[in-house]
Amino acid sequence: MSEQLSIADARQAEAIGRQVVLQGWVRTRRDSKAGFSFLELNDGSCFGNIQVIASADLENYEQEIKKLSAGCSVSVVGLVKESPGKGQTTEIEATAVTVHGLADTETYPLQKKRHSFEFLRTIAHLRPRTNTFGAIARVRNCICNSIHQFFQEDGFLYIHTPVITTSDCEGAGEMFQVTTLELDKVPKTEAKVDFTQDFFDRPAYLTVSGQLEAEIFACGLGKVYTFGPTFRAENSNTARHLAEFWMVEPEMAFYDLEDNMRVAERMLKRIFRDVLEKCPEDMEFFNLRIDKTVIETLEKIIDADFVRLPYTEAVDILTASGEKFEFPVDWGTDLQSEHERYLTEKHFQCPVILYDYPRQIKPFYMRVNDDGHTVRAMDVLVPKVGEIIGGSQREERLDVLQQRMKEQNLEPEGYWWYLDLRRYGTVPHSGFGLGLERVLQFVTGMANIRDVIPFPRTPGTAEF
């Protein structure tokens, strides 16, 4: 009796001699004058294809098998044999090929030629069938699994924070509003929208971060993390911005900024190590076709110590560098991507953790240092991408937190529960946010962030 195998398993030497059922999509078909056809089959379980040898003796050979083309779906029953072909361990000698669905060669968008990533974004429902996007999906899966394993093995609890919220973690106001009010008949009181008639009885938004809610659980359960979609209504049409993306956000009670840095560094190294070990074919593809330095870069980072650098020293290095930056460097301004890349690619040539940023450019929840001018913020910078992690030690002192909220014109009534955490058993605690898509860009070398998420959401684009 035949056993169903993935193509990933059927390509291993251990499968030789087994009668199997494989299912997948045809990549190519070529016919031999000797009376058989070679099918290249892929099912998404791995980067590589498996070769199927279909004999002319099969009953549907002339009517169906010889009409197969890229995109057709089939089931194959056959014997796994050692392949004499170069670069492949096994092949399948088919005893039956069942055709499930054909793909018209005249209209099927994925032809043998290379397609631009811009074109593939217009057919996001088909791009997982390409080498590039199949590889991205597998690496994305590996990274997510690695993140969960890292935190679970370290005693963190995985919690779920709300997607719909009434608070703005970043205080930037760039949030998507959620409402059931009819937009052409919005109820008003004294020229203002009457939100008491809305679903939640108040303004509600899609979350920009689960951090504040994660702090609730950290301040009762110790170490937690959340991993889910977040939303930013920034009108940014760049290769680094999405309106919807995925974030992992750990929060740790009794952790200071140094502890926070250590967790962030260990997590990144674990992710990079797992990707290299578990997705070798996919990474070889990215190294060959996208960026010839990705594997070497990851290997160097795994073996390197991340540089810890105060913001003030970073500004001194940048101003003394002699580089002509598009954006001038001054103490008190946020560093731009070009500054971050100079530090990681030219000056230190390794990842850098910047910390102790100016108070006025960071959110209200970051702990104020004793100098009164800086806060316990940190950003992890990596070559080619720049910032990949942002975090801080949180402000645990009630009076200081209230003053910071006042400075940033935040209404304390909307954060009463957040202030309560400082009233009852307050504790030093820290956390950070890691953008999944930024990590994927770095690991794969993909230039545009829209190509590392299945269905990109950007200004003017919400297809599928």
Task: Give the ranges of each region predicted by the language model.
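A translation/RNA-centric and nucleic-acid-associated enzymatic feature enriched
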Residues: 164, 174-273, 284-464
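Residue-level recognition of alpha-helix termini/interfacial anchor residues
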Residues: 61, 278-282
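Class II aminoacyl-tRNA synthetase-like tRNA-binding/catalytic domains
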Residues: 2-249, 253
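Generic non-transmembrane alpha-helical segments
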Residues: 146-154, 267-278
